[in-house]
Every structure is written in C-alpha cells, then in structure tokens.
C-alpha cells in the first residue's frame, strides 16, 4: 500500500520544521569543527570565538558586547576573557572616560593563534565548496535575510553586513553581475560578494537601513 509522506502524523513535516532540522544538523557539524579548531589551539570554542570576534576590532569591545555577540552570559564571557588574558592573547583596558567599564582587545599573540586556527578548514567549509556557485550565492542571500530578521527582533546584535551599512547602495548598477555599489571603496560588486562581517562597515541610521533593505530584497 502506498503511504505518502504527508500521512505520517508523528513526523511533523512543515517546511519550517524541516528547515530547522536541517540547520540543527549543520550546527552540530559546526560545533564539531569549532571544537577541533579550538583544541588544536589549546582553547575551548568560546575562547576561540572571542578571539575571532576581536580580531578585526582594533578598539576592542566591552564584556557585554562580547557576551551579546557570542550569545553567552556575561559571567561566562568574563571567565573566558580572564583565561585568554592569562595566556597573553587578550589585554584589558579602561573604556573611554568610564573608568569602571572594561575594554577587551586582542594581542599580537592572539592574532597568531587565530591565523594558525584558520589554516585547518573543517567539514562545513568542504560542504560549502561542494555547492555550485549559484547555490552558494542563493544560500548567502538567504542567510543575510535570516540574520537581518534576527537583528530586527533583537535576538542578535546588529552585524557588520552590507544590508545595515551606510556605504551600501543595492542595485545601483544595471550590470547583473555587479549590481551593488560600495561607497567605501567606490566600487561595484555582485551578490556573492555581499558581506556578513565587514571591517569597514559603519551602521546606517534606521531609516536608511529600512530604505536600503526595501531596495535590496526587491532587487
Ligand atoms: S563597507 Fe563593507 S559592509 Fe559597507 S557596503 Fe562596503 S563592503 Fe558592504
């Protein structure tokens, strides 16, 4: 007897549920990759993630910002920062005029650890490489849309994506291969060059971000 997939009530099959199942499997593999890379550096994944977060932030970040970006509690972030400081991979200083606030910055030794960890790519990088070019591009844009939603509902801090950058001009050009413009470098670029974490990013004001997003997603 033929039983269709839709007749298996014990197995929820909404597309939303199945996508989350898929993301969960990918998250499992990413955690495994992170453990391998961190272990090779003599760190744990949270410590390595803190170094990666601070790598391109010359002015450092406060403990609260670090915790929010990593999705961990402030006490947990504080413990990891203390461990990294003992290893000489981070340094702490006062943040601006508020002498009680602590600013955390990566040291040259910390940068060296990041560079060594980067040399070993894991299975997730291989699985992305296995996608066709157009599939990579579609996935990148889908991720940007999901991340943007998570930002909007305050689930994560604003990321340094083109979609929130004051230099971003989506679909400013008629060239289908390079429709966007970055006013920071004054150059056209394509969908697959859209940034998730750009060092030159400067957050646009909310009205600019909303207008930019409208153009981007309708493009
Ligand atoms: S500065 Fe970076 S984030 Fe901003 S538009 Fe250019 S590439 Fe995108």
Task: Describe the function of each predicted region.
Residues 15-22, 46, 62, 106-109, ...:
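N-terminal positioning helix adjacent to the helix-turn-helix/winged-helix DNA-binding module
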Residues 35-73:
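N-terminal helix-turn-helix DNA-binding core of bacterial DNA-binding proteins
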Residues 58-102:
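Canonical helix-turn-helix DNA-binding module
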Residues 115, 119-166:
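Terminal interaction helix/tail motif
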């Amino acid at each position: 007897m033929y039983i269709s997939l839709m007749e298996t009530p014990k197995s929820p099959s909404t597309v939303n549920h199945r996508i989350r199942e898929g993301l969960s499997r990918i998250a499992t593999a990413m955690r495994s990759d992170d453990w391998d890379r961190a272990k090779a550096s003599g760190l744990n994944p949270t410590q390595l993630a803190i170094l990666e977060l601070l790598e391109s932030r010359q002015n450092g970040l406060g403990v609260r910002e670090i915790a929010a970006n990593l999705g961990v509690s402030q006490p947990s972030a504080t413990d990891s920062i203390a461990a990294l400081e003992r290893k000489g991979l981070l340094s702490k200083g006062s943040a601006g005029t508020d002498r009680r606030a602590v600013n955390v910055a990566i040291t040259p030794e910390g940068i060296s650890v990041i560079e060594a960890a980067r040399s070993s790519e894991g299975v997730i990088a291989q699985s992305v490489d296995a996608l066709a070019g157009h599939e990579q591009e579609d996935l990148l844009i889908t991720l940007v849309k999901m991340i943007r939603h998570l930002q909007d509902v305050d689930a994560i801090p604003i990321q340094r994506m083109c979609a929130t950058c004051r230099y971003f001009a989506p679909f400013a050009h008629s060239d289908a291969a390079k429709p966007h413009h970055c006013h920071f470098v004054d150059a056209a670029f394509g969908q697959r060059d859209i940034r998730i974490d750009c060092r030159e990013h400067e957050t646009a004001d909310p009205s600019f971000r909303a207008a930019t997003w409208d153009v981007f997603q309708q493009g």
